[in-house]
Each structure stands twice: as C-alpha cells, then as structure tokens.
Amino acid sequence: MLEVQSSNHGCERQAPTTSPASSAGHAVEVRPGLYLGGAAAVAGPDYLREAGITAVLTVDSEPAFPAGAGFEGLQSLFVPALDKPETDLLSHLDRCVAFIGQARSEGRAVLVHCHAGVSRSVAVVTAFIMKTEQLTFEKAYENLQTIKPEAKMNEGFEWQLKLYEAMGHEVHTSSAVYKQYRLQKVTEKYPELRNLPRELFAVDPTTVSQGLKDDILYKCRKCRRSLFRRSSILDHSEGSGPVAFAHKRTGLSSVLTTGNQAQCTSYFIEPVQWMESALLGVMDGQLLCPKCSAKLGSFNWYGEQCSCGRWITPAFQIHKNRVDEVKTLPALGSQTKKP
C-alpha cells in the first residue's frame, strides 16, 4: 500500500497514512497538496485515491498509466526523461511547473514522481518551489532535502536549475543562456547527428524584412552582405580558460551573461542559416562570407577561447574587424554605420 508522509513545513493538512511501504514507494507531502514520490506510489489507482491525489506528473522513461488506465477525474502529464546528466529537463520545466500550479489552483492534490523519487522528480519540484516562492536554487533544494533527506538530483539537473534561476525562473528560448545551453546539448551528440535541428539556426537576415523596431545588423566589411543580428550574439562573462562542460562546474561562472566585453576581439554567436552547409559533418572549420567568401572567423564544436579568457563551447566566432555594426532605423528605412 502507499504510504504518504506529511512533512512539518507549516501545512496543517493531514495526509492519510496506510501500512508501511518500501522507501521508493513513499510519497512525501513537501507543500500543501504537493507530493513527491517514486514509481511504487502509482502502482495502482486505489493508492492514489486513498491519498486524495487526483493529478500525477510522471518524469520517467515510461508513462505511469497505460492508455485508458487510472480512474475517472485523474489528470496526468508524462515527461519522458532518463536520470542522466545529459538529459534535457530544462526545456520541460515551464510545462511541469504550469501543470502543478494549475492542479493546485483547482484544489487538486498533485503527485510528482520518477522511478526512485530522488532525482528527476526532485528537480521538477525544486523548480516549482524556486518559481512560486522566488527562491534561489540552493535555498529551494536545501529546503526540499530537509523534508526528503534522500533527495539527490544528478549534477546535470543541478546545472540546468541554475540556468533556470539565471533566466528568472522561466525558460526564455530567445535568451543567450538558453541558446548556449541548446548548443551544448547538440554538441554532446555531435558528430553522430546526421542532421542539425533546423531550430538551432538563426534566420538569415537577408531573408526577412526589417521589423517595426530599431535593429542592429552586422555586415561583411568587404561586400556589405548582412550576416547576423544583435540578438544572435551570445554574450559571456570574462573567463580564465577552458573547462569541459558547464554542468561539471560548481557555480554559474559558465552561464552566458550580458556584460562589458570591450576587450573581446570576436563575437560569439548562434549559428545562422547561411552557415549550415559548412557545419554539417565536421568538427571545426572557417566561417566565410556567403557572398564574397571573405574569411569572417571560425567554428569549433569542442569550443574556442575568447581573447578575454572565456572558453565557449561550442564556438561560432566572428572577428570584430571583419564586420561592421549597422543600426537600422525602420521608420526612415535608413542605416547608420557605427564608428
């Protein structure tokens, strides 16, 4: 039978308890109406009914309920994820947090579970606490571990939650933080990938018209061909040298942040559509202007070091002295070259 434990965190709700269960089957109430557990907690619909749980979020390799299983009124969400550092959990966090929040707002008790109830589900619940209580990753995780001492997410999930914090507890797909994260996830699978995801590439600025807002374009200094927009630049903090992958670091020093990069002699950008043919199937090479073939910079999926010392992985590097920065004024349709 399911054993539901009620933690002492200011909640007066009394959770029902039944006969003792294995550790993996425990469902611990970590916040009012929010439970955290393992696979045994969803072994049968009767267990959930006894605990008053009517919403289940499964973060595992397989869904908790086959099609048509469960019981009437049960809401469920399945997020496919392995308990490995390289698993992309970050991209699913907004959907998970929204599911938990919506269910609780409807007065439902929610169970978040994975297989053992110590890593994947812990990461999701930590993200929910971070967002709803505006806590740092460290504070939210520490609080959860006081309630469920065996909670121990893998280092990859820890890194992803730090990125989640850096983005303000919301996954902004247009932010430099997320773009660099997405590139790193592709790098982990490269060069085995047969095709690069289309969404990995920024739109070629020559294929879209100027928007309603002022914009900054970067053009080939030799032939004036538009190459990329300001939004494609992945700003970074100053560094002191190469470190393997960001999730192996202890802090947020690897997170790309907007800052003063006056000493940097290159722009590190997200790949743009005109680069696609040059990137596929090779680990490194030159980046040439698609119009005049002038050398603009280089790329390396394993990373390159900026002149400021920061190691960027992967790296799509454009030398500043090979491009001009041009501000476009849409109202006048004019362009002004910056000095």
From Swiss-Prot:
PROSITE patterns: TYR_PHOSPHATASE_2, TYR_PHOSPHATASE_DUAL
Lineage: Eukaryota, Metazoa, Chordata, Craniata, Vertebrata
Residue numbers of N-acetylmethionine PTMs: M1
Pfam family, one: DSPc
Species of provenance: Rattus norvegicus
One example GO MF annotation: phosphoprotein phosphatase activity
Protein name according to UniProt: Dual specificity protein phosphatase 12
Domain Tyrosine-protein phosphatase: from-to ranges: 26-170
InterPro entries tied to this protein: Dual-sp_phosphatase_cat-dom, DUSP12, Prot-tyrosine_phosphatase-like, Tyr_Pase_dom, TYR_PHOSPHATASE_DUAL_dom
Comp. bias intervals (Polar residues): 1-22
